Design a protein with these regions (language model features):
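Feature responds to low-complexity, polar/acidic, surface-exposed segments characteristic
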Residues: 1, 11-66, 70-101, 106-145, ...
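Short, flexible, surface-exposed loop segments at domain boundaries
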Residues: 149, 153, 159-206, 211-274, ...
Length: 429
């Protein structure tokens, strides 16, 4: 849903919830389509018109329904309204929308008509939707009502579908940056500090951070993703479309090496000297050989591959180190637990394995670092079992320990007290 939130297509149902299992009315879907077409600024001009008898002046979606009904799509041979009523002058705005209706509306938004779909409705439109990838990943019959999550998937699919003219839809929404982009941080301040809600990316023309044209820049699910960024003529974000390269997220079991990294579980990944490394705190990437030393054991990275080769790496916290910039959670976590990391900030986001979680979902012994740029707590549950061998400066108050295999680890300040209870020869995790 964050792709659509960035575009202004959705905004949740209140309390910052998207409610993916909730149903969707015809009026709600119509509003989403208008926003998807980036026509929301035109809606107020249609508020005084009466097109459907049951979409009265008091209806919340009147302007959007009227705009959609007045928007003609198709080609020179056939023009159809984006939406139509039920045949008796009514629109039934509060009835739940079906899969067939939703697919038909989006196909029309892409410029298709009965010339391509045929005269049999809804099956002709459903077949056409399937052939262009519009219904990929959605299991619903033509007459089945759809959930908000299914509707969101339709819109996300539509971004990458070809329109009736053979052009990929998102490419016609604005200027597509020539290089694939990684979203480094979200909901950040603009360069001049005049506004918040910008998105910082790896591909910048005139600024480090872009504001969305219509939507919300607080899109944590997109942070660290790589894809195509589309801007309007004001250098505002119209949309972001993740690409189809393979993305693999791992936690490092040891320090990164000049030509490789090893993940928890022992799997090793090869890095080329020209593999690019990006962090949330930088606007430009580094070649792997120039930046790999910033990645220590416990760092979480996302690797992007093309044709079997890792071409880019993203690290949410950049210079993740095992020092006082991290906290081991020993009991129930509260905002106060991380006061030393955040400097007292309490409006942070919490992420674990690329998923947003709550403080109550952080478990004892989880390790938490803080990404100041993104105002995000990054949670890791990496566990390594080994034999404790020695400690410095003393076993009772260790700041550094050595374990079997000759490896050394710094001890977090928050774990000093608990580590003092162990002695050489103990098996520890």
């Amino acid at each position: 849903a964050d792709i659509l939130r960035l575009m202004g297509v959705v905004s949740g149902t209140g309390d910052d919830r998207f409610d993916p299992s909730g149903t969707l009315s015809r009026a709600q879907f119509c509003t989403m389509v208008v926003n998807f077409l980036q026509k929301q600024d035109d809606a107020p001009r249609y508020a005084t018109r009466t097109i459907f008898s049951d979409v009265k002046s008091s209806h919340w979606a009147r302007s959007y329904v009227n705009l959609a009904a007045s928007t003609m799509v198709g080609d020179d041979q056939e023009q159809l309204p984006l939406i139509s009523g039920v045949g008796d002058g009514r629109f039934l705005p509060d009835s739940q929308i079906t899969m067939g209706e939703a697919a038909t509306i989006l196909l029309r938004a892409l410029g298709y008509s009965s010339k391509q779909a045929g005269a049999v409705w809804p099956q002709g439109y459903m077949d056409l939707a399937g052939s262009i990838g519009l219904t990929d990943g959605i299991s619903a019959g033509a007459y089945s009502t759809i959930t908000r999550a299914q509707a969101a998937q339709l819109f996300v699919n539509a971004l990458s579908c070809k329109d009736a003219g053979g052009k990929v839809y998102y490419e016609g929404l604005g200027s597509v940056l020539p290089q694939k982009t990684i979203v480094l941080a979200v909901d950040v301040e603009t360069d001049d500090g005049s506004a918040k809600g910008a998105v910082r990316t790896t591909a910048n023309k005139t600024s480090e951070a872009y504001l969305p044209a219509h939507g919300d820049g607080d899109v944590p699910a997109l942070q660290g993703k790589r894809g195509h960024l589309v801007l309007n003529d004001k250098d505002e974000i119209v949309t972001f479309v993740p690409d189809d390269s393979t993305a693999t997220t791992v936690v490092l079991s040891g320090n990164a090496q000049p030509g490789s990294v090893k993940a928890a579980g022992g799997k090793q990944y090869t890095m080329s000297s020209d593999t690019m490394l990006y962090t949330s705190g930088a606007t430009e990437g580094k070649a792997w050989t120039d930046g790999y030393t910033d990645l220590s054991a416990g760092a979480q990275i996302t690797m992007y591959s093309e044709k079997g080769k890792v071409v880019a790496v993203y690290s949410a916290s950049g210079t993740t180190t095992i020092d006082s910039d991290a906290v081991v959670v020993m009991d129930h976590a509260t905002a106060a637990t991380f006061h030393g990391l955040t400097g007292g900030a309490t409006s942070f986001r919490v992420m674990k394995g690329r998923q947003t979680i709550t403080l109550s979902q952080i478990q004892p012994n989880d390790v938490v670092t803080y990404d100041q740029i993104g105002n995000t707590l990054m949670v890791s549950d990496l566990r390594l079992s080994c034999v404790y061998q020695n400690a410095e400066p003393s076993i009772k108050a260790p700041t550094k320990i050595s374990v079997s295999g000759g490896k050394e680890f710094d001890v977090l300040e928050s774990a000093w007290d608990s580590c003092g209870s162990f002695k050489p020869g103990d098996s520890v995790t």
